């Protein structure tokens, strides 16, 4: 392991997360390798608010989707929610005070299994992003669900070429992986840290030196990198 630790985060970290590594002497480089933005128009607000008046089952797999929907709501929905753990669930609990979270999971695959286990659920609304994976929609459609998907935000790649040889790199999404490796390479010694299974799957195209979070959060990901570089 090299003497001076250089860590790249493919998403700008909170000051506290960056300080966790910097306080041990690591150099932390940060860049948002993807950009997300709501694509819901004022015209879409009517549909969102109409759905909010119905006691629907809905899916959120990203905090970005939660923010996009919340921005257009005129009142609190009374939805029954399935969501991804970590930041997505925390954002739902913060912004949607009247919803009922029926189930949450750390991955899309596990979340799909939990939704399928609810035999009373046959119609469901999925608030998704433009680059979402097919894991959940594929499983639900295969099982005969009436799935209404509404794309509420888009993800754009914002790569930057870096000449540094990093000790470790933090990845937060498959899109972030695609963005980084579109203009960069790594050495075989570089340790990669993944927020979850979908990101890990994308990283396996480039390396086998991958550590994955057991819980999808920035704090957990930084903690894994901390334990890797500063054990004991």
PLM features per residue range, with description:
Residues 1-232:
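Signature of uroporphyrinogen-III synthase
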């Amino acid at each position: 392991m090299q003497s001076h630790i250089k860590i790249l985060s493919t998403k700008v970290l909170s000051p506290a997360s960056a300080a966790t590594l910097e306080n041990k002497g690591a150099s932390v480089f940060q860049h948002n390798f993807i950009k997300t933005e709501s694509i819901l128009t004022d015209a879409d607000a009517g549909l969102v608010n109409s759905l909010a008046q119905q006691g629907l089952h809905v899916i959120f797999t990203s905090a970005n989707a939660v923010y996009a929907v919340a921005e257009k709501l005129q009142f609190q929905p009374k939805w029954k929610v399935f969501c991804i753990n970590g930041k997505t669930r925390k954002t739902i609990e913060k912004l949607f005070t009247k919803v009922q979270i029926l189930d949450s999971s750390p991955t899309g695959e596990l979340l799909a299994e939990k939704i399928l286990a609810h035999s009373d659920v046959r119609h469901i609304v999925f608030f998704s992003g433009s680059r979402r994976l097919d894991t959940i929609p594929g499983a639900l459609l295969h099982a005969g669900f009436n799935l209404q998907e509404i794309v509420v935000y888009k993800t754009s790649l914002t790569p930057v070429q870096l000449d540094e040889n990093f000790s470790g790199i933090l990845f937060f999404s498959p899109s972030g992986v695609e963005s980084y490796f579109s203009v960069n390479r790594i050495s075989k010694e570089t340790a990669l840290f993944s927020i979850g299974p979908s990101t890990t799957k994308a990283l396996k195209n480039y390396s086998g030196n991958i550590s994955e979070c057991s819980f999808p959060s920035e704090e957990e990901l930084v903690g894994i990198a901390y334990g890797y570089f500063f054990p004991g």
